[in-house]
Amino acid sequence: VFYIVNEPFADVKDAGRRTLKAFKVKNRFVHFEFFRLTKDQRLGKKGDIVALEVNMRPSGGFSPDMMNYANSTNVFKIWADVMAFGHSDLKCGEKYFCAFAGRRDGKNFIYSEKDITERYAGSIKTVARVPDVLSGAMGNVMYIANFRTKAEMDGFYKDVLATK
């Protein structure tokens, strides 16, 4: 599982902006991966934001689509506008938590795909087979859905992943 938050934390935004500045990034579609320390370590204190990856390219897999769903926008149009015109006027719309859950073949799930798609009909954005090349990391069947609250998203994860 992974998800796009409905609003990034201020310290994560700050870390991203400082990373852009440090790498002198202009007019690029980039993605950075940060994590928050859950205890004091050599890298920093509990709660600190630490960079895991700095990528000068869009994120892979289905995450650009999830960014679109989470922000009611089109990140590819924004990128094209920036490349063509130096800026984009496209605004984000309503914000959501966008959840990805992957199921593995051969597991005995409590709820069928039909059960999940009916229960979460208003939230589901995509249900599809994951390409074999990605299935080792992401599962064989993916569910992508939007939620207004983290609690709703957590309930979705619980239902999608529950086994007998």
Locations of regions flagged by a protein language model:
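Glycine-rich phosphate-binding loop of ATP-grasp-fold ATP-dependent ligases
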Residues: V1-V5, S63-M66
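Conserved ATP-binding module of the ATP-grasp superfamily
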Residues: V1-F2, A10-K13, R17-A22, F156-K164
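Short beta-strand micro-motifs enriched in acidic
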Residues: F35-K39
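Alpha-helix N-cap and loop-to-helix initiation/capping positions
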Residues: I4-E7, N71
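Peripheral (often C-terminal) accessory segments that flank ATP-dependent C-N-forming ligase machineries
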Residues: I78-K164
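Residue-level preference for beta-strand/loop junctions
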Residues: K26-R28, K46-D48, A137
